[in-house]
From Swiss-Prot:
Its main location: cytoplasm. The gene is gmhA. It comes from Shewanella pealeana (strain ATCC 700345 / ANG-SQ1). NCBIfam families: PRK13936.1 (NF010546). This is Phosphoheptose isomerase. Coiled coil: none annotated. Pfam families: SIS_2. The keyword Cytoplasm applies.
Length: 197
């Protein structure tokens, strides 16, 4: 059992090393898009299922409250939080529409959708992306494995942050780190600090 625990740490470290080579450019591009979105008076909507829903909430909480520096709140909404809305849509229509209907109501041109799925094949996240595109929003996707069906929906205006791993737990661990990198870049760009302070 101890070896298995050590192996999990080793695998996580190796996945992060691999990601540190593969992902910085796409994370930087996504952060720049998010900064421009926020400077333009727009907002960021985020969605995912299970652990990815938790990641969406984590991201929006960091923007609405703060990440590491004191600053004004920034507009972000996690679409996985309103249980009454989610269950109404799932009951009356289908689970695949729980995010897309919210995007059709809340999304505006210039907004960004942060779409999170370790496999890239979550039906309701794919529908969310389709709704975002119909609302002239841009998309930042956080995926893993081969990017799944989500990869095929992205245009040159969108950004894919695809973790180089096939293991769900390792992908989720890097997703959290990528989210922290996004938040750090957003904060440091919008609210530059004296690095020596």
């Amino acid at each position: 059992m101890l070896e298995r625990i050590k192996d999990s740490f080793t695998e996580s470290i190796q996945t992060k090393i691999d990601a540190s080579e593969a992902l910085p450019e796409s994370i930087a591009k996504a952060a720049e898009m998010m900064v421009n979105c926020l400077l333009g008076g727009n907002k960021i909507l985020a969605c995912g299922n299970g652990g990815s829903a938790g990641d969406a909430q984590h991201f929006s909480a960091e923007l609405l409250n703060r990440y590491e520096i004191e600053r004004p709140p920034l507009p972000a909404i996690a679409l996985s939080c309103d249980t009454s809305t989610i269950t109404a849509i799932a009951n009356d229509y289908s689970y695949d529409e729980i995010f897309s209907k919210q995007i059709m109501a809340l999304g505006q041109p210039g907004d960004i959708l942060l779409a999170i799925s370790t496999s890239g094949n979550s039906g309701n996240v794919i529908k969310a992306m389709e709704a975002a595109l119909s609302r002239d929003m841009t998309i930042v996707s956080l995926t893993g494995k081969d990017g799944g069906a989500m990869a095929g929906l992205l245009s040159v205006n969108d950004v894919e942050i695809r973790v180089p791993s096939n293991v769900t737990a390792r992908i989720q661990e890097v997703h959290l780190l990528a989210i922290h990198c996004l938040c750090d870049n957003i904060d440091r760009t919008l609210f530059p600090q004296d690095e020596q302070a």
